[in-house]
């Protein structure tokens, strides 16, 4: 029979796993906001770049917390690109390409990780 500590550790591990799945579901939903931000950046909306930076910063930290290093790394990469975009001229084609590519890489990683975890992806 497990003692209280062992049972408590198992319950904590189960709770963290459930929170990780919630993170994946939420992040799948945030991919829509990320795509909208990138599109708005292409249209010249500087506030969308700042919003993109905030979203990716949150995904970066939370992904690492719940054991999704690939998601965390791609979010960190996109966060750095967004920070650089804030210092670049609005509409810089090279920067816009980097934003689009970074968003694509993050989306691919989130979708692959969610699929592997059994989280359904809405199209």
Report residues per predicted region:
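Amphipathic alpha-helical interaction segments
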Residues: 31, 37, 74-76
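Helix-loop segments that flank and shape redox-cofactor active sites
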Residues: 33-50
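Amphipathic, coiled-coil-like alpha-helical segments
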Residues: 2-13, 17-35, 87-123
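A ubiquitous short alpha-helical element
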Residues: 15-23, 42-43, 62-69
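Extended, amphipathic alpha-helices with heptad-repeat/coiled-coil or helix-bundle character
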Residues: 46-84
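Short, charged/polar, low-complexity loop and linker segments
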Residues: 6-11, 39, 50-54, 84
């Amino acid at each position: 029979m497990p003692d209280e500590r062992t049972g408590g550790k198992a319950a904590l591990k189960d709770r963290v796993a459930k929170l990780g799945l919630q993170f994946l579901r939420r992040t799948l939903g945030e991919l829509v906001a990320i795509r909208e931000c990138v599109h708005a950046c292409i249209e010249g909306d500087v506030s969308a770049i700042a919003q993109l930076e905030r979203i990716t910063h949150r995904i970066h930290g939370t992904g690492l917390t719940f054991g999704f290093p690939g998601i965390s790394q791609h979010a960190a990469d996109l966060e750095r690109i967004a920070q650089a975009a804030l210092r670049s001229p609005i509409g810089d084609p090279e920067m816009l390409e980097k934003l689009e590519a970074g968003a694509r890489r993050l989306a691919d990683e989130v979708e692959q990780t969610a699929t592997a975890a059994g989280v359904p992806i809405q199209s």
